[in-house]
């Protein structure tokens, strides 16, 4: 979704969706400086459909006031593909358990460097992921996932060390070659 642009992400994704309960997240600070962030959901299959349904006019406004660029158009196409390819939201009263998902994570390069890690012992990236994993565990979810670019070997290694395992190497609806990792909180 980041391809849609920073305006969409700032004005809608990171602002409206957490207040409505579709997303949760955290910002990590080190020495008073923002070092990184994470966003996640307790409902991987349904959050996007529910957010779209709850915010149709707001999404149309934000999209309509953003300058269309080839990258944004690709982002809109990818989001539409993800909506079409996602599992339908189960009817109330069914036994389908929601799955969590880490949606985005970012840590400033200065806080990911070997020098920073070796001098402080603080692994901001790992701490943010573990915080989301705690959120999934507290929500009593049976499974969580994260989609990682296939060529992002470094972060795939981090997820493996934290107990995540690859499930599929071609993720339906994603244009960027990606790998799905899953984790079972129980």
Locations of regions flagged by a protein language model:
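Conserved acetyl-CoA-binding loop-helix of GNAT-fold acetyltransferases
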Residues: 107, 113-136, 157, 161
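Short loop/turn motifs at secondary-structure junctions and domain boundaries
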Residues: 16-21
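Conserved GNAT acetyl-CoA-binding A-motif
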Residues: 98-103, 134-149, 177
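Short hydrophobic/aromatic beta-strand or adjacent loop that forms the aromatic wall/cage
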Residues: 23, 101, 175-182
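Conserved active-site alpha-helix within GNAT-family acetyltransferase domains
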Residues: 150-168, 173
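Conserved beta-hairpin
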Residues: 22-42
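Conserved GNAT-fold acetyl-CoA-binding loop/helix
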Residues: 1-14, 52, 58-59
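Conserved acyl-donor/pantetheine-binding loop and adjacent beta-alpha core of acyl/acetyltransferases
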Residues: 46-106, 112-120
């Amino acid at each position: 979704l980041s391809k849609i642009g920073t305006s969409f992400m700032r004005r809608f994704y990171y602002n409206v969706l957490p207040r409505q309960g579709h997303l949760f997240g955290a910002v990590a600070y080190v020495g008073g400086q923002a070092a990184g962030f994470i966003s996640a959901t307790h409902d991987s299959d349904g959050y996007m459909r529910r957010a779209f349904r709850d915010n149709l006019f707001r999404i149309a406004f934000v999209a309509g006031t953003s300058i269309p660029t080839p990258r944004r158009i690709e982002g809109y196409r990818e989001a539409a593909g993800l909506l079409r390819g996602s599992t339908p939201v189960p009817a109330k009263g069914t036994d389908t358990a929601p799955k969590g998902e880490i949606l985005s994570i970012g840590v400033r390069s200065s806080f990911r460097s070997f020098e920073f890690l070796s001098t402080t012992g603080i692994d901001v990236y790992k701490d943010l992921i573990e915080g989301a994993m705690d959120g999934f565990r507290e929500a009593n979810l049976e499974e969580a996932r994260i989609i990682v670019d296939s060529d992002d070997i470094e972060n795939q290694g981090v997820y493996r060390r934290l107990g995540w395992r690859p499930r599929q190497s071609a993720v339906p609806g994603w244009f960027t070659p990606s790998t799905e990792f899953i984790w079972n909180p129980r």
